[in-house]
Amino acid sequence: MTIQRILGMIAVSLLAVIAYLFFDISHRLEKARSEDPLVWVSDIEAFAERGVGEPESLLFVGSSSIRFWGELARDMTPVPVINRGFGGSKIGDVVYYADTLFQADNPRAIVIFVGTNDMTPQ
C-alpha cells in the first residue's frame, strides 16, 4: 500500500468524522432550540429504562452542564449519584418530564441546574 493511498484513506476517514460531528451538533442545536418537549422523548425513555438508581443517591437533573459532568461520580464520592442531564433542555422540559426525571429511591438530595438554555436567543 502506498503512502498516498494511506493518506487518502485517512483523509476520507477524517471527512466522515467531521460530517458525523457536524450532523450531531446540528441535531443537538435543533433539539435545544425546540419549544416542543417531545424532542427529548428518547433521552427520557433511556432514563426510565435505567430505573431509580441506588437508594440514598444524589440525584442530578438538568441540561448539558449536568449531562457532560464527566467526573460527577468521582467528584461526589463516596455518595452514589444519578445523572439525569439532557443537554439543551429548558425549565419547561424538566417540568414536563418531572415524573420520570425525579424517580429515585429515597434520594439524599436533588440538584437541579437548568435554565441557561431558556436565555438562548432563537
Q: Model-predicted segments: where are they?
A:
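Oxyanion-hole/transition-state-stabilizing segment in secreted/luminal serine hydrolases
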Residues: 66-80, 92-122
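N-terminal secretory targeting modules
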Residues: 1-60, 70, 74
